[in-house]
Amino acid sequence: MKLMDLLEEIDTIEIKGEERINIENIYYDSRKVTPNSLFICIEGFQTDGHHFIDQAIKKGAIAIVAQKDMTGLDGVTWVQVKDTRQVMAQLGSTFYGRPSQHLELIGVTGTNGKTSTTYMIKKILENHERKVGLIGTIANWIGNTEVEAQRTTPESIDLQQIFKEMADEKVTECVMEVSSHALALERVAESEFKVGVFTNLTPEHLDFHENIDNYREAKKKLFYLTTVANVINIDDPHGAMIAEEVKKLKPSLITFGIKKQATVMAKNIATTLKDVTFDLVTPVGEARVTVKIPGIFSAYNALASIATSIAIGVPFDVIVQGIQSIPGVPGRFESVLGIKDFSVIVDYAHTPDAIENVIQAAKNVTEHRVITVFGCGGDRDRTKRSVMGEISGSLSDLSVITSDNPRTEDPYKILMMIEAGIKKTKGLYTIIEDRREAIRYAMKEAKKGDIVLIAGKGHEATQQIGSNVIIFDDCGVAREIAKEEGLDDSDIHS
């Protein structure tokens, strides 16, 4: 595509050089640049793309888009703009032929429940014989083809490329997790959403957003990008605030909840270790529904997916069949099979609200003890560490504090911050830095009927310690320990 065509709708400050050159690709990572490409300088949290212009040119970049004034770029077209992040989204959409226009795009945002909700929506739509794409934390899916996910929401140029691949493969709907970072950093700009979904909002990422109000404002942006409907949990106080504000917009407002009167509701809820059952009440039909993921939080996720499906016209009987056919979501209250006498549950819960929900869900389905193994990630929001410790100390019969992904932080210091919260309670706890040994301790400590809850990493298959990334899968490790310690049931195979 000609550079002049790419720049046609871009608000530029200045252009130096030839505009009639042909651009074969667009990059923001100088290491990936190929000949005849355009390089966009993005100011990141740790690096600044402006520092890698020379490297990009040496690798073949023939045009540079930057926020800073540059000189001495002979033979290279230089384009200065006010905001390269916003422009990257515009360029990506134009370069790939505005692909989101060819998809029914559904965005799901919220602190917790995004992954489960997107998987549920995908399953319902597939039950409606649709070819569905999914973009999220665990993986990206183009129909039945799985593609590794690098982050919850890809950078805008990568996102537009994924949309293009989906459109080329005749995907009809794309369901995607939309993180607050993605909304704040313009990753989903130029993406045309039909439906926006709000699950809930509790303190998280405050190292980035600084306070809960900024966090909510970032999430709220999604509902100004939609054209058909906004689906919002009004039991959540932040959701109620957002719903009140966006109800005046053109897209229809569909609310869901359990406590407050809403468009879509769950009543008479019963939960077991294997599932949650409730009376589904909607404007288009009512039914007794069983979802194979236990917990009240699972009922909320199901309501979000059901309300979304109603918004885009899926028949009620198809919705009910679809939501009940979901086998589960990887790392979301996932039972580790093959263990005798007690249960082991693995969950991604890594926020205060999430860990409270999963511990409470475990307590609701056993009359015995709940032993919680958890930690907190390094180089992330530090304010939640003592809070999570206090929650586990208050609710768990025994807390085993361990490493999550310490990254570049001292693991011991993270553990001490968690311990400070537990000390505010009368809860029993122990500290075992090595995650494998912490899981081993909890499983050896468990008695008949107990639940060992391993929280924080869920589906993740690695652990990051310093600059090292090691293979570590909570489910797999639990199975290995069960076999090593004679805790496995040879008659059950996972």
Curated annotation (Swiss-Prot):
Binding-site positions, UDP-N-acetyl-alpha-D-muramoyl-L-alanyl-D-glutamate: S30, T152, T153, S179, R187
Binding residues annotated for ATP, in chain numbering: G110, T111, N112, G113, K114, T115, S116
Enzyme class: ligase
Main location: cytoplasm
PTM entry text: Carboxylation is probably crucial for Mg(2+) binding and, consequently, for the gamma-phosphate positioning of ATP.
Cofactor needs: Mg(2+)
Alphabetical keyword list: ATP-binding, Cell cycle, Cell division, Cell shape, Cell wall biogenesis/degradation, Cytoplasm, Ligase, Magnesium, Nucleotide-binding, Peptidoglycan synthesis
N6-carboxylysine PTM sites in chain numbering: K219
EC numbers on record: 6.3.2.13
GO biological process, one term: peptidoglycan biosynthetic process
GO cellular component term of the entry, any: cytoplasm
Gene3D superfamilies named among the record's database cross-references: Mur ligase, C-terminal domain, Mur-like, catalytic domain, MurE/MurF, N-terminal domain
Catalysed reactions listed for this entry: UDP-N-acetyl-alpha-D-muramoyl-L-alanyl-D-glutamate + meso-2,6-diaminopimelate + ATP = UDP-N-acetyl-alpha-D-muramoyl-L-alanyl-gamma-D-glutamyl-meso-2,6-diaminopimelate + ADP + phosphate + H(+)
Motif (Meso-diaminopimelate recognition motif): 404-407
GO molecular function, one term: UDP-N-acetylmuramoylalanyl-D-glutamate-2,6-diaminopimelate ligase activity
Amino acids binding meso-2,6-diaminopimelate: R380, D404, N405, P406, R407, G456, E460
Pathway, per record: Cell wall biogenesis; peptidoglycan biosynthesis
Family: Belongs to the MurCDEF family. MurE subfamily.
HAMAP family for the chain: MurE
Summary of the function given for this chain in its UniProt record: Catalyzes the addition of meso-diaminopimelic acid to the nucleotide precursor UDP-N-acetylmuramoyl-L-alanyl-D-glutamate (UMAG) in the biosynthesis of bacterial cell-wall peptidoglycan.
Protein name: UDP-N-acetylmuramoyl-L-alanyl-D-glutamate--2,6-diaminopimelate ligase
Native source organism of the sequence: Alkaliphilus metalliredigens (strain QYMF)
Organism placement in taxonomy: Bacteria, Bacillati, Bacillota, Clostridia, Peptostreptococcales
